[in-house]
Amino acid sequence: MLGAGTMGAQLAAHLVAQGIEVVLLDMAAPAGERSALARKGIDGLRKLKPSPLHLAEHASLIRPGTFEDDWGELKDADWILEAVVEDLEVKRQLWGRVAPAVSGSSVLTTNTSGLGIGAISSPLPADLQAVLDLLSDPPG
């Protein structure tokens, strides 16, 4: 999962409830623990009422990390779901970084409410394809 904000963290909670292993990546924190932003996203799940975590222990199944330190995790990922800020340039830059890091069999999806898949996926080479999804309110 790329992006540990509201959408990314809640989608991660939904996925682990389905038995899907999730690595939740976000930017490295400027000070302190580098994966603090991803951990903050996970911690925030416990505070929501109702919590999107089906079981409290599901939080421990989401592994926090950073784009900078844990990018290698993408190499073996079956599915890469991007849920970063709704900004075309941010998404394009991120997908440009994803392309050389993934296997050709990875499923790439972007979560967006109004940006076109063609514009977002333009940095991807022809042998990689991305899918647009709109999960506007992750189930709790």
Can you name each region flagged by the protein language model?
Residues 22, 78, 107:
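Hydrophobic "anchor" residues on beta-strands that sit immediately upstream
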